[in-house]
Amino acid sequence: MTEAFICDAIRTPIGRLGGALAGVRADDLAAIPLRTLVERNAKVDWAALDDCMLGCANQAGEDNRNVARMAVLLAGLPETVPGATVNRLCGSGLDAVGSAARAIRSGDAALMLAGDRKSVV
């Protein structure tokens, strides 16, 4: 069985209720760390990315679509890269990372992006 590794990690700024990030759309906020990972890892063939899985609890309003897919596009990743949004409430991000690792370990994927995006408005 293939091993899965976390090769890089980044997070968005920590905000507070009604703070400076309250007006930032969920997909725009999620695209920031994705774009930064792409820039920091320029030698990676991002066209070979199998999927991007992001946790997002309680999608509503502007969040009421596939936030992961929108973040992939906003981050400038190739249009061929899919995105899957996982909703497990508080465990969404953990489930997204676990699912990405399982895809790699089972041989269904070779390169995955996974994480979470939360926003307290």
Task: Cite the ranges covered by each PLM segment.
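Condensing-enzyme catalytic core mediating Claisen C-C bond formation in acyl metabolism
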Residues: 1-24, 36
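General beta-strand structural signal in soluble alpha/beta enzymes
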Residues: 6-7, 54, 82, 113-115
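Conserved catalytic cysteine-centered active-site region
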Residues: 24, 56-110
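Short, well-ordered amphipathic alpha-helical segments that serve as non-catalytic structural scaffolds
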Residues: 26-42, 67-71, 96
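Signal peptide-proximal N-terminal region
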Residues: 35-48, 76-79
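Short glycine-rich phosphate-binding loop at a beta-alpha junction
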Residues: 47-55
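Conserved small/polar residues in nucleotide/adenosyl-binding loops
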Residues: 118-121
